[in-house]
Amino acid sequence: MKVYFYHTQNIQYCLRRMAEGEFPSHFLYGACHLADNGIDVVYHRSPKHELSRLKTALYTAWRVLTCREHYDALYATHYKGLELVVLLRALGLFRKPIIVWHHQPIVKSKSRLRELLGRFFYKGFDRLIFFSQKLVDDSLKAPKADPRKLVVGHWGADLAFYDKIKAELKAEQISPSHHLTISPSQHLNTSPSFIATGKEQRDQPTLIEAFNRTGRHLILYIGINPNPNVPNPNLEAVERCEPADNIDVVKICGLLPYEIAREVAKADCVVICCHRTRYTAGLTTVVEALALGLPVICSRNPQIPVDFDRLGCGISVEYGDVEGWQRAVEYIATHPDEARLMGERGRALAEQMFNDERCAKEVAEWIKQFSL
């Protein structure tokens, strides 16, 4: 059996960096391990330059419909860019089943016309994979998609990639509290160190205020756009908060999973402070922390499929709760043995449930259902 694999990111760039050992396979949502489960993959040829949404949809449809290699199903990380193909499937003009990851809950539209169009659009999907049961439960409240098409997938990290990074750092004999991007002499207290990465829906004011009060060492990575005409809301939010000297703000540009993972691996705790959302904001950082065996302090997002407190791999804090963040940071800082155990439990959870090989196995099982 063979699938056509579509991704909103540049697949060829990802594969090239993977071959160089600088890109984790989980960003391809199990596609790299489908062959281990009896499914070959035709990789979508991503456009060389960024296109508008309409042009992307046209380009993708052209690539999918004119593919010379035989394939039995279409597997995608997102429906963005696939809209025309999905509509053709809904009309019965595209004969291959479509299996797609759905990143947000399906919601009912206020407009009757948009709701009717949405219900028709969702007929074009044969399987919708969600990151958590909460996303499925919320989606069932909107009568757009057939409940039988909704499933929960365990998206998780490329464990071998993070094990390789940890081995590299051990070989280089770099102390966990020594970060390449800062001068440790700037801080009287460089251990334990906390690290914040990611960009989606981050609540920088709450995080910075908590660390301003605690005086604990935070390395805060902020993704920026090099184009001066493009706003950088995350950076602007950080600058307005006036971080104290114990907070190192590091500006980064581009997709740098290997470089960032090396820095995360040197930290003692990963912090993920987000605004309230309807989706799994911060999940990429969560699975990375679990893979590296680090404790996590995270905003209490019910969409994320990890209950940190119950599973003992971290601490959850309510949205916008500065004092709650202070308490969590101080607990990790003053209970190093428990923090270490949290990290070990998180790694065990990654090995058992949240890893790329399990993700691929589940996806392969859903794809094979359409070969009968």
Regions found by a protein language model. Give the residues of each.
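Donor nucleotide-sugar binding/catalytic pocket of nucleotide-sugar-dependent glycosyltransferases
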Residues: 126-140, 145-164, 168, 174, ...
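Acidic anion/phosphate-binding donor-loop and adjacent secondary structure
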Residues: 140-141, 157-174, 178, 186-191, ...
